[in-house]
Amino acid sequence: MTTANDAQQLISFIANAKKVTPVKVTYKGVLTGEIPATVQQFGGVSFGQLIGDWSEIQPLIAALPAENVFVENDARNSAVPLLDKKAVNARIEPGAIIRDQVTIGDNAVIMLGAVINIGAEIGSGTMIDMGAVLGGRAIVGEQSHIGAGAVLAGVIEPASAQPVRIGDHVLVGANAVVIEGVQVGDGAVVAAGAIVTKDVPANTVVAGVPAKIIKQIDSKTQQKTALIDALRGL
């Protein structure tokens, strides 16, 4: 079970991290001053590109005409970098936003537009569909499916609070919301649009607002909600 110490480590990481405003600057002209070691430079003396923190790059380009500078920037005083996805043994589609300190299991699938916050855990073979949101410390087991637009509420603070925990072989339908601290048991199905405010027993189907048990999993339900292994191959 996730402990308060785990949460406290994340809180400490965010609080103590150096806040950066990452930029990519294309410039034409002569820079002012020496380029810090923490800034990457590509190109020549009077034309090139700088990559680094705005606080270090801004003085270098301050004397250049505005028309000779193009700045690309998508964050301000950011405390948590994005995950380095190159070594992840999973399929991650363009447009997914995944913060650092996220764990992704083998053969998982992260679709376009998914947002996954710090401390989240995704089991092997699990699919996070388009536009789904996994809040801080949310946990999803193996071979599960989180539907498009679904939200697993995050809980970084208070540190003592329990995160959302989704079991193995669970299907969470499109646009469903699972509230902080709720646990969904193995093999359960959460219907599309449901708002889950209480724990869901294993092998049950819940639906509605708030979500209530409507039946036990049967063979017909299993056929309708079966996952396709071919979609998880690399």
From Swiss-Prot:
Its EC number is 2.3.1.89. Keywords: Acyltransferase, Amino-acid biosynthesis, Diaminopimelate biosynthesis, Lysine biosynthesis, Repeat, Transferase. It comes from the Bacteria. The keyword Lipid metabolism does not apply. GO terms for biological process: diaminopimelate biosynthetic process; lysine biosynthetic process via diaminopimelate. InterPro entries: DapH (IPR019873), DapH_N (IPR013710), Hexapep (IPR001451), Hexapep_transf_CS (IPR018357), Trans_hexapeptide_repeat (IPR050179), Trimer_LpxA-like_sf (IPR011004). The keyword Transferase applies. SUPFAM superfamilies: Trimeric LpxA-like enzymes. It catalyses: (S)-2,3,4,5-tetrahydrodipicolinate + acetyl-CoA + H2O = L-2-acetamido-6-oxoheptanedioate + CoA. Pathway: Amino-acid biosynthesis; L-lysine biosynthesis via DAP pathway; LL-2,6-diaminopimelate from (S)-tetrahydrodipicolinate (acetylase route): step 1/3. GO terms for molecular function: tetrahydrodipicolinate N-acetyltransferase activity. Belongs to the transferase hexapeptide repeat family. DapH subfamily. Catalyzes the transfer of an acetyl group from acetyl-CoA to tetrahydrodipicolinate. This is 2,3,4,5-tetrahydropyridine-2,6-dicarboxylate N-acetyltransferase. It comes from Leuconostoc citreum (strain KM20).
